[in-house]
Amino acid sequence: MPEIRIAALDLDGTLLSRENTVTPATRQAIADAVARGVVVLPATGRALANLPPLVAQLPGVRYAITSNGAAVWDLGTDPLGAVYSRYSDAETRQTSEPACLVRRLFPVEKAREVFGLYQEFEGSLSVFSDGRVIRDHLAQERMGNHQRRLLSLSTEAKQPNDGRFHIVRDTAEWMSRHAHEIEKFCMFFENAEAAEAALPRFYALEGVEVVQGSPDNIEVTAKGVDKGSALLALADRLGIPRAQTLAVGDSENDRAMLEKAGVAAVMANGMPQIKALADLVTTADCDHDGVAEVFETLGL
């Protein structure tokens, strides 16, 4: 296999264990790869504001792909400080803020069309904009344990409008003023069956990308927006050819990244159809140093 110069890591089920931790061996493997000059970055469906602190604090992490590829960020030399700076109150804001290198938003009319379709279903709808998660009070009330777990990773203590996610009175009213700023839509349904029943309606939309981060959700970005295209855009910006890019993932929302990267690695806990895309499938899962195994196998 070619020398790897940039490695994009999915979070849930890949970099993060089921207990939402990074194993010591994986942390060390990342530090060693960075010391050798490899660019290692998270590639997530989350908004920048909800990037877990333990990920932002990984050794040498400077860049992040967020919102399923709708944005690519340069977090500078203090990633955690940069994220907190951008989404903190003005009184506590630092001078260093993350720079958005790539941002690919919905065309206004397409954003309105997608939002209109989501309104036909009951669930917890979040709108991703400018690195934040926007939802209204009804969506917040519908939010189940899965979504609460995801939000809990953004910070240990927070208030509803601390900047990392923003609760508005009415999402439709907010959309009337911000339809030109949308990175991604994401709805969590009551269960996987409800999401599966709704999927055909979303697949019928033109000019969008539809993925599932989990069986009970549906996520939509603009056409051509995915983790894979974001990885290649960053690699091109850094002068790294596609052949020297690595993607590591486990689920359907990693498909485009795995298909487009020069080398694709899938975790032992990955979905069978995703393992079929891999150049390398680990013997270890996300709880047992799977990412470290990838790095060791590829000599990173």
Model-flagged regions — what are they?
Residues 2-6, 22-23, 35, 203, ...:
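Mg2+-dependent phosphoryl-transfer enzymes with acidic/Ser/Thr/Gly-rich catalytic loops
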Residues 10:
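Active-site residues of response regulator receiver
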Residues 57-60, 67-68, 205-206, 260-261, ...:
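Short, structured coil segments at secondary-structure junctions
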Residues 117, 121-124, 128-248:
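Conserved acidic, metal-coordinating active-site core of Asp-based
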